[in-house]
């Protein structure tokens, strides 16, 4: 899978100027920002949407919540242009913050549900977007959000999900979302670049692991471009990247099976994968011992022509599914 990164410094003088003039002063004083033109106008070209500081949260950003606000107008435009949102989409935005992306997403979609865990930021965002059609601010933990219920309440079958994800909670968020994969049309996330490499890694490579299998079971994931620390306020210690996910059918989907049956199998398989990668470089049988008898795991992998000492990181998504299927009767 091809991986494309944006060179830094930017090759375009205009891009560099846009980045430093819109962000430089914000790096000295962390501030929340909003796309002024996108919020206040019916429709403006993306190039005309500029980020302008509106206020600081009264207590500043909260490091424990992994808050790094996207403050670069140049990269915000690139992200919106790269995210495959359709005009009739219901978009769920994870970690809306101060709305740096919310207005721009709403210009492309039918409706945006901006989910923000921080009650202070959610309240401020409601005030800023008061009266703006097509945007709903929801103060909630994404890990407690039921996508099926959300889609049902908005009269749609699927949703598109976007987020600038807190680096420390990327895996739990993906695990939670993919339990409801049939309700997701597509996804795009800004994540730590190291995490992006893990998501797109192939079996047997150093970055390959639980995140790789999690993403690749239900999507074709690719890195769109990288984002430097200076595009955020406060700047993180690492580079970030935009990763897009084109959803595919999962291995659990069987002809004639009901959606409920598929969902149950999907959840069991995701839990199986999580257990299989519980400790890196440990044998699959040992990692799964809390869920399945170790002898049953070894017998299952040997029946598939694999070594009884195999590790999860050596197996492809298809291999892991075969092992899971072989173990179905051993619990």
Where are these regions (language model features)?
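A short, ordered amphipathic alpha-helix with a cationic face
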Residues: 19, 258-260, 272-275, 286-289
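Compositionally biased low-complexity segments enriched in histidine and/or tyrosine
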Residues: 28-34
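Intrinsic-disorder-associated, low-complexity terminal segments enriched in Asp/Asn/His/Tyr and depleted
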Residues: 18-19, 25, 37
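N-terminal chloroplast transit peptides
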Residues: 1-6, 14, 26-27, 48-50
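Catalytic cores of RNA-modifying enzymes
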Residues: 38-267, 271, 302, 329
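C-terminal lobe and adjacent flexible extensions of AdoMet/dcAdoMet transferase-like proteins
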Residues: 275-331
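Short polybasic linear motifs
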Residues: 9
């Amino acid at each position: 899978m091809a991986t494309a990164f944006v060179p830094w410094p930017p090759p375009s003088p205009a891009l560099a100027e846009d980045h430093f003039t819109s962000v430089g002063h914000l790096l000295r004083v962390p501030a929340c920002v909003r796309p002024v033109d996108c919020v206040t106008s019916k429709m403006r070209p993306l190039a005309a949407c500029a980020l302008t500081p509106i206020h600081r949260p009264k207590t500043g950003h909260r490091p424990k919540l992994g808050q790094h606000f996207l403050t670069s107008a140049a990269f915000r435009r690139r992200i919106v242009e790269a995210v495959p949102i359709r005009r009739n989409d219901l978009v769920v935005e994870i970690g809306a913050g101060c709305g740096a992306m919310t207005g721009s997403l709403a210009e492309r979609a039918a409706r945006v549900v901006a989910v923000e865990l921080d009650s202070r930021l959610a309240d401020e965002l409601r005030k800023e977007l008061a009266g703006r059609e097509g945007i709903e601010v929801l103060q909630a933990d994404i890990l407690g959000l039921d996508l099926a219920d959300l889609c049902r309440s908005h009269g749609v079958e699927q949703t598109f999900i976007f987020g600038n994800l807190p680096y420390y909670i990327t895996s739990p968020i993906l695990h939670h979302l993919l339990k409801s994969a049939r309700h997701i049309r597509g996804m795009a996330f800004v994540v730590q670049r190291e995490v992006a490499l893990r998501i797109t890694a192939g079996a047997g490579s150093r970055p390959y692991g639980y995140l790789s299998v999690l993403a690749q079971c239900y999507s074709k994931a690719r890195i769109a471009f990288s984002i430097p620390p200076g595009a955020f306020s406060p700047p993180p210690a690492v580079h970030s990247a935009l990763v897009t996910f084109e959803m595919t059918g999962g291995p659990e989907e069987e002809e004639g099976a009901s959606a409920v049956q598929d969902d149950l199998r999907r959840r069991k398989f995701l839990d199986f994968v999580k257990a299989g990668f519980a400790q890196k470089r440990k044998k699959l049988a040992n990692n799964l011992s809390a869920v399945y008898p170790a002898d049953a795991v070894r017998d299952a992998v040997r029946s598939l022509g694999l070594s009884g000492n195999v590790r999860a990181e050596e197996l492809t998504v298809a291999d892991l599914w075969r092992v899971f299927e072989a173990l179905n009767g051993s619990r």
